[in-house]
Amino acid sequence: PPHRRVAEPPSRRVTETTYLEAIRQGIWEEMERDDRVFLIGEDVGVYGGAFGASAGLLEAYGEARVIDTPISEAGIAGACIGAALTGMRPVGEIQFMDFVTISMEQLVLQAAKIRYMFGGKAQCPMVVRTMAGAGLRGGAQHSQNLTQMVTMVPGLKVVCPTNAYDAKGLLITAIRDNDCVIF
């Protein structure tokens, strides 16, 4: 590949870790395992993600697989759908769940229904990774938990891990799934 590994990969030793580090490990391991996996979203590259979940990935995998986007949640979702339909396995990061609402047209009318609209002959293997809930002093537009809303959409899979161990395992499972998963 045209990039060189500058950052150290996460440790694979059995250790106590944080939820955030578990997410970082899951993304890193799947990008290492499968060249079709890539990360796309606001500030995921140079900045390392809003909370640091993608720190080091840009240096390790390059700009072709760690893609910084403008502030356009609908664009992130649309790019993920298009890439998924061509055989890629995108992980789209939407920084706060509040802004999943901006991408609902793509997620509800396209990603969730592709398998059914094409009689099972098409798949949309993508993950939308986001953060939900209060506690970070995010204010009215950065603290909602809209999980219940997205669970009501037929065809979307929704995963809400409660601990670091489950977060890593379920993220890996979500990336390998052949349907759209909201994580």
Regions found by a protein language model. Give the residues of each.
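Thiamine diphosphate
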Residues: 5-182
